[in-house]
Amino acid sequence: MSFVAIIPARFASTRLPGKPLVDIHGKPMVVHVMERALESGAERVIVATDHIDVAHAVEAAGGEVCMTRADHQSGTERLAEVIDHYQFPDDKVIVNVQGDEPMIPPVIIQQVAKNIAQRSVGMATLAVPVDSVEEAFNPNAVKVVRDAQGNALYFSRATIPWDRERFAVSQDSIGDNFLRHIGIYGYRAGFIRRYVRWEASPLEQIELLEQLRVLWYGEKIHVDVAQAIPSAGVDTAEDLQRVRAAMR
């Protein structure tokens, strides 16, 4: 099975300016992500960026870069520009690898690529079990509920599903029904082209979760349990210090 991994690497970040280029043991973070993607077996790994310094860093490490506009509202919109630039056919499998996850396990990149290749759904993604009360109630940890076929019913920053009987007694423990979404996506190039033509949905704008646009327009998202649990990504200076320590 062949697939292309695309890494959106936006330079501007409110909480961590110049995030793709922050140093982790002598390499820019985006280069670490690129190396993990190459280890996944992708036939091609492309870093999509709006900043020339990011492009130079990737090229210096032997990577492939596609320069994109700076006004994209989401990583998926940036991907759409890349697939049109390269004129990928509609059936080409594309995996969107987040540019701020330098410790992403290569096996889950391959997993999501296989899942979209084997299913007739619009999008494939992954989740991991929630194992703490703090995570279940943390709005920064996106939860997902699935149907019997493993397709997403809804993604939310809220605590879903709400365990009515358990939580009526206490919110000090959780059951086994919670899944945290991991922000990695697999699609076919043609689906990305359709996605960016859709208007943003009300639910997407309320939750600030772009995958809700897919459900709003009646498409399916398959959610598999990840074969390996990735470390959290880098959003803040504190996250960066944690990742540096973990990667020693």
UniProtKB/Swiss-Prot annotation:
The keyword Repeat does not apply. It holds the Pfam family CTP_transf_3. GO terms for biological process: CMP-keto-3-deoxy-D-manno-octulosonic acid biosynthetic process; lipopolysaccharide biosynthetic process. InterPro entries: Cytidylyl_trans, KdsB, Nucleotide-diphossugar_trans. It is an enzyme of class 2 (transferase). GO terms for molecular function: 3-deoxy-manno-octulosonate cytidylyltransferase activity. It comes from the Bacteria. Keywords: Cytoplasm, Lipopolysaccharide biosynthesis, Nucleotidyltransferase, Transferase. One of its GO terms (cellular component) is cytosol. It catalyses: 3-deoxy-alpha-D-manno-oct-2-ulosonate + CTP = CMP-3-deoxy-beta-D-manno-octulosonate + diphosphate. Coiled coil: none annotated. It is found in: Cytoplasm. Pathway: Nucleotide-sugar biosynthesis; CMP-3-deoxy-D-manno-octulosonate biosynthesis; CMP-3-deoxy-D-manno-octulosonate from 3-deoxy-D-manno-octulosonate and CTP: step 1/1; Bacterial outer membrane biogenesis; lipopolysaccharide biosynthesis. Its EC number is 2.7.7.38. Activates KDO (a required 8-carbon sugar) for incorporation into bacterial lipopolysaccharide in Gram-negative bacteria. PANTHER family: 3-DEOXY-MANNO-OCTULOSONATE CYTIDYLYLTRANSFERASE, 3-DEOXY-MANNO-OCTULOSONATE CYTIDYLYLTRANSFERASE, MITOCHONDRIAL. Belongs to the KdsB family. This is 3-deoxy-manno-octulosonate cytidylyltransferase. The gene is kdsB.
